[in-house]
Amino acid sequence: MIQPTHSSRRILLPARGWFIYLSLCAALLLNLIPLGRLPGIPDWVALTLAFWCIHQPLKVGMGAAFFFGLAMDVANASVMGQHALAYVLLAFAAGGLSRRILWFPVVAQALHVLPLLLGTQLVMLMIRLVTGAEFPGLLYFLSSFVAILLWHPLNYLLLLPQYRAIEHDENRPI
């Protein structure tokens, strides 16, 4: 499958389904690391979900977002459906914007992903406030900004298994 980006015109191998869901499970495990209430820790599931919904919108969508959202709700003991709703909206927006976002270089992709991640956090914050929680402060949104700084390494890491080996063949022009 051809992935249009400015930085690379390489033809990528198809993404394997097991690798996609393994990376989402690894992101879920990263979210479960008990780091307390440190500001700036990114939501790894949201970041990885946004990546796969942009790069493989036919393989990862709202169903996977709902499943991993419920898993996060259970893991965090939060209001049931809080993460699920936010992740489904993230998957819908990322899948809808995937063709547009892929035309930009990786740095510009990160800037396009920032409103998606901020929107995800805003949905979760609104649900918390409706259920009676206190406003956590503006540092709550710092994790989205840290996440876009991690977009480039995550992009490289998750696309690495899809890169085709560069081998020159006289009979094959591509």
Regions found by a protein language model. Give the residues of each.
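Terminal, non-globular segments
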Residues: 1-174
